[in-house]
Amino acid sequence: MNKIIKYSIFMALLLLMLQSHAQAPEIIKGTVLQYNNSKLEAVPYANVFWLETQKGTSTDEKGNFTIEKPGKNPSHLVVSFVGYKNDTIIITTDKKEIRIILTNNTELSEVTITGGMEGSYISRLKPIKTEVITQAGLNKLACCNLSESFENSATVDVGYSDAVSGAKQIQMLGLAGIYSQLMWENIPFLRGLSSSYGLSYVPGSWMESIQISKGTSSVINGYESVTGQINVEYKKPQTAKPFFLNYYISSELKNELNVFSTHKINKNLSTMLMGHGSFMGTKWDENNDGFMDQPKLNQINLFNRWAYEGNGYHSILGFNFVNENRDGGQMDYDENIHRNDTVKYGIGIKNQRFQLFTKNGFEVKGMDETSIGIQAAATYHKQDVYFGLATYSGTQKSLYLNAIFQSELSHQHLYSFGFSYQYDNYEENYTKLKSNKSYDTSYNRPRVESVPGVFAQYTFEIPEKLTVIAGIRADFNSYYRTFVTPRLHVKWNITKSATLRASAGKGYRSASVFSENMGYMASSRTVMIVDELDLEEAWNYGINLSKCWEFKENRKATFTIDFYRTDFINQVVIDIDHSMHHVDFYNLGFNNTGGKSYSNSLQAEFNIDAFKRFNVGVAARINDVKVDYLKGTMEKPYVSKYKGLLTMSYATKYEKWMFDFTLQLNGKSRLPNMIMSPAAPVYDNYSPAYAFLLGQVTRKFRNFDIYIGSENISDYMQHDPIMGASKPFSNAFDASMIWGPIMGRLFYGGIRLTI
């Protein structure tokens, strides 16, 4: 704990010193006013930002603000406030002080950006259906990291992978998160060794937005997207506030500190340094099974990037370093005493990850709408894990390169082409001992994949009416084979407020069975790879309709409905039904099991501003996911058959107080066949449906916010999440059968400081 506090103080002082050396920028001062019964009054806490950069501030209690002037002239300054139309002012070089009067004018201005940031919305501009979770939406929850950022979303499900490691996993369209391509600002991010624990490597306070798209994505981004894509946008040094600090503490005494600072070197060059520290050193056992409900944890996460913006050229260069340790198991487990015996059961998880990245864009002079983009990243990841007598060590070395040329034949005909290269070098070792210390099983699986690829994409567009994107790519995988990935996306604006989208395409991925399925190590099951695993391959088809209505006072309502189907040509099947003593991995169709594996997902969502500053959202989803196993065609385990979602948000005048509430209704899911186990609880082959409630209250001040909240308000918990907890080295032990909450009611609080 003392190390975390010392580190946090050091980081805060360092970033403040860096900020103090920034060059003095040119400042615009102003006041925002409104008419009230023919009298002018100040408008406190209005949003003020530059249109070109979205760099902004807010007014104080007297309606005053100061903002740094961008280098470009003239510049457009936008002022927005809930209940008023935006005002846009053209700032020239001679303007130092301005006065802005907001009115309730119902006529649309030239700039039609809505006042007040929505928590989430469906982008009407993108051909691929994309749900955007904004900064405002992220602030409605504690959002300690990426895994906790989807509680308000009906698209993504989040749950624990096991009852001892604290790791969370996601699902989309009823399939595991590994089939969704996870990106950081359009660079492949969490893959390979990061699959099981990587969601915690993305602190919530670092994120500017999350973009969730269903179905296959553009061929420009690669071939791995099967069910969708999750792209995370971090805060930028060009637009972020100079200094930010967020401190969080929970009723379980988990502490988190996020701090960052931006530094503008000159009008073209800027940098940002981010630091994150999380610490949990207290042991808890709410269900009295003798095991820690959450492991002890400490994580240090550093991120630095430099951004250069010149005439026709921009570049980003940076690095990310993560060091995380988790220690758990039985309450009285001591690693120094019990590490190699069968007296007490313990777990240890150590991760070190380092990544370098760069993004570059060039405008081609003399050619309209023509540019070249180059992205590159290098990643090193070391992982050492043990669960009782099962141990795993893995190393990943990866390189990524993507080069894109984009131009147009005319305003209606755009094209892109380029090449990519993905290199992955895995060294994985897995060993499981029996209780008498004899070998149960052992695997040494080195794997090197060198994948050069080429792609081309054509876009036909009738502005405000129709967009068609057809893409194809070919990749040669040195470990597997050459494969071709076709994809098609269509967007039709039926009316100005109704949009129909459709998509179809293929996706491929290579499975890393150990690093992607760490949860099964928390059991007595033996890993059995009974087939020569092939490349996973699937088709995905989808259609969705969205409709928007606009009302007075800037209120609106939206309705979306979509259906997506995924058909696997080949899948690495994870079979935990064939035997309770091992987990089998094999290709779809192995041993004449058939060749069917599919997912159907139907979802509808309605969101409305019921009245001024009060928003209500309701959503419902149905999943139908089945796989051909050795025992026949069965529903995929741990996939909820349905889900309901209710969200409510209310803000007082000037958004001084904000109240957010979420209710999830999670449907039943099939449990694996455990009839032979005397330790198995009786659920009639299905888990029960349950409700999960969250709430948060935020008080906003000039430069800081205070928030308090609660998760799992109803205190609903899965009974006996660890089978055979009293005999962890017996064949009856299994901590991987998780279908519901394993933690009880939790309270938290925190402060966000922005300077």
Regions found by a protein language model. Give the residues of each.
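Short acidic/polar hinge/loop motifs at secondary-structure boundaries
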Residues: F65-E68, I187-K214, L302
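Gram-negative outer-membrane beta-barrel transporters
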Residues: P463, Y564-D567, Y586-M674, R752
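Extracytoplasmic beta-strand/coil segments of soluble accessory domains associated
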Residues: E68, S147-R191
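N-terminal periplasmic accessory domains that precede
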Residues: K96-I101, L146-S149, K168-Q171, M183, ...
